[in-house]
Amino acid sequence: MRSLKLMFFLVSVLWFPVSLCYATATTHIWAPSTDVQPYKKWHLTSDFYVPTENNSDGTRADTITNLGLTVGVLPFEKLNAEVGFDHKSGYGTLDDYPWYFNIKVGIPENAYGKFFPALAVGIYDIGIKNDKTDYNVLYGKAGKTFSIDNVSLGRFSVGYFKGDSKLLTHNGKKDNDGALLCWERTMTEISDKLWVAIDYQGSRSSYGATNVGFSYKFSDNTSVIFGYDFYNDRDLADTYTVQMDIDF
């Protein structure tokens, strides 16, 4: 069944003309990217994660919703920063504490020469309830675009994250750190608006997942990502995700 779902998703990627430029402001599909919002630019996101089936124990996972707002706060060309917050729901009793905050600082790709990668460090999911929602996921990431004879191979990103050891667990044991990996590419051969990505976050905590997706950019400031999330903990149901992003 899972293989049929993946085949359907990949056929959708190839069949439908969808798009975006590199990533959303804070994430690729799932994990943080090296992108940072420009100074005074606001970024509104509305994300949905819909389970494809029951968890392995037979329980039905809730649909997760996330409404977030981020803004760029540094007026420099070679050093950017953004701050933001998210309102999340679908986590049962944790919905009593729905607010989470994030901060990121980054240096754009090629800022100090053509071989210089994009760099970013940050923290996200800073919750307001101690030992319940204070996941406090710290990360660092580097990304670089490669090409051969003016043909882009896409951007490759690699990084590392670490979160709260009491909350990022698997089977009762801490599993709170791991790799961040991503490949993404704007498919200019088809359209400058067509963007695809494969995104990975390590661990078998609830943060660990492999994600595949594409995006369509409806206008200069509005885009929608369509993706599929394979959780590293195979006891958890996979999810479809739809994410709308608006810059203003």
Where are these predicted regions, by residue range?
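Cleavable N-terminal export/targeting peptides
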Residues: 1-30
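Transmembrane beta-barrel domains of Gram-negative outer membranes and organellar outer membranes
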Residues: 22-149, 162-164, 179-194, 199-201, ...
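Alpha-helical interaction elements
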Residues: 153-157
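Sequence/structural signature of beta-propeller domains
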Residues: 217-218
